[in-house]
């Protein structure tokens, strides 16, 4: 299957930014700005082509394991967000995660060491000579955006950023990267970091070349995305990958070709990516949602649609993913699609999402039996919400 992988990773970076904004208060578009600054610096150092693409990918995903770390190690006690040597744990997790992704070049240790300081005072005690260049570039870009991104990109901030780099050269950041940043960013260029056009500039520098992926690679990519979505809340900690696996199984059971199976697997993994834009106070509310809270929750499917819309030639998979709460009678959300507007895969995803949600165990409930879940699906089909033919296929496919 041919995919715009960098576009997918960009969408993933938006999801990460949403989660980080809630948990550790990074500024909007943090990952993309880190990627843009990194690419501009790398150009000054003679890096180009596939290496530049891989640097952009690493920069977009530099904090891919932060939410995983908070969930697993800190049990979501955000007051204890990692400092100093503790930062190394999320770097280790992030390094392991990106090994699943299809890079063009060797990016070993780039994520692992992206919080190392030039003088060896970082979490792993590595000096700048021992750290991959990509790690050092991302480290500088990340530091600047975390320190100044939320304050806006003005002449005053530019002067403060330059002052910070000069003051910390040789201790926190290395001279090679400081020089590259100062060569890449004059004041007018720095000011564009606060404008929407910097994203356009990023993709002009890094053409999004499509890659041919084997199904095993697609499964790894999908698992990576699903993990980011599912670590948003322990209430749905395995839901996305469960939907992906069910989508694969049902698609094969119904006789679809392997490309359709691959697309359905990816759509299943991504179907709830929009939930990253919904606060955990709603996702994890133990009681019934208020009308206003449910209205916010319903937006997650629309967020999925819009997040995935930025990926080239992804409309089909986007729709299969985003329409999982639509109903045949037009009473679903977010777009109120009717039967005439919903194709077979979109109808399948609606059934699969409900079936998986009913049968999986969560902290507040035990999963239902196959028989009980199918009773509910048939009730929804009889109301005109779900496709009866597909409900029957679900019943037969997942029995036993």
Q: What role is predicted for each listed range?
A:
Residues 3-400:
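Histidine- and acidic-residue-rich, metal-dependent catalytic cores
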């Amino acid at each position: 299957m041919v995919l715009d992988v960098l576009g997918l990773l960009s969408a993933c970076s938006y999801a990460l930014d949403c989660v980080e904004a809630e948990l550790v208060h990074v500024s909007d578009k943090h990952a993309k700005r880190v990627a843009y600054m990194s690419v501009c610096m790398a150009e000054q150092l003679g890096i180009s082509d596939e290496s530049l693409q891989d640097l952009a990918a690493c920069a977009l995903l530099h904090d891919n394991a932060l939410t995983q770390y908070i969930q697993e190690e800190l049990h979501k006690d955000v007051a204890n967000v990692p400092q100093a040597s503790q930062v190394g744990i999320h770097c280790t997790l992030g390094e392991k995660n990106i090994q699943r992704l299809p890079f063009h070049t060797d990016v070993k240790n780039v994520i692992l060491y992206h919080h190392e300081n030039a003088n060896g005072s970082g979490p792993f005690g590595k000096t700048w000579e021992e750290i991959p260049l990509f790690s050092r570039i991302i480290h500088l870009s990340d530091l600047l955006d975390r320190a100044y991104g939320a304050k806006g990109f003005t002449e005053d901030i530019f002067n403060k950023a330059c002052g910070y780099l000069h003051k910390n050269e040789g201790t926190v950041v290395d001279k090679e990267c400081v020089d590259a940043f100062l060569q890449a960013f004059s004041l007018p260029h720095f000011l564009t970091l606060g404008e929407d056009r910097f994203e356009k500039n990023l993709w002009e520098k890094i053409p999004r070349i499509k890659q041919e992926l084997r199904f095993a690679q697609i499964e790894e990519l999908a698992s990576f995305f699903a993990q980011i979505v599912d670590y948003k809340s322990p209430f749905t900690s395995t839901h996305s990958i469960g939907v992906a696996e069910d989508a694969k199984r049902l698609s094969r059971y119904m006789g679809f070709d392997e490309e359709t199976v691959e697309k359905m697997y990816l759509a299943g993994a991504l179907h709830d990516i929009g939930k990253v834009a919904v606060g955990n106070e709603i996702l994890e509310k133990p009681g019934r949602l208020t009308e206003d809270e449910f209205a916010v929750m319903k937006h997650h499917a629309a967020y999925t649609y819009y997040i995935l819309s930025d990926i080239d030639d992804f409309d089909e998979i986007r729709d299969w993913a985003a329409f999982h709460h639509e109903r045949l009678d037009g009473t679903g959300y977010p777009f109120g699609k009717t039967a005439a507007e919903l194709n077979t895969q979109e109808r399948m995803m609606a059934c699969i999402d409900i079936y998986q949600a009913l049968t999986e165990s969560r902290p507040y409930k035990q999963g239902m039996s196959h028989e009980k879940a199918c009773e509910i699906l048939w009730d929804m089909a009889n109301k005109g919400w779900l496709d009866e033919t597909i409900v029957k296929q679900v019943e037969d496919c997942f029995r036993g």
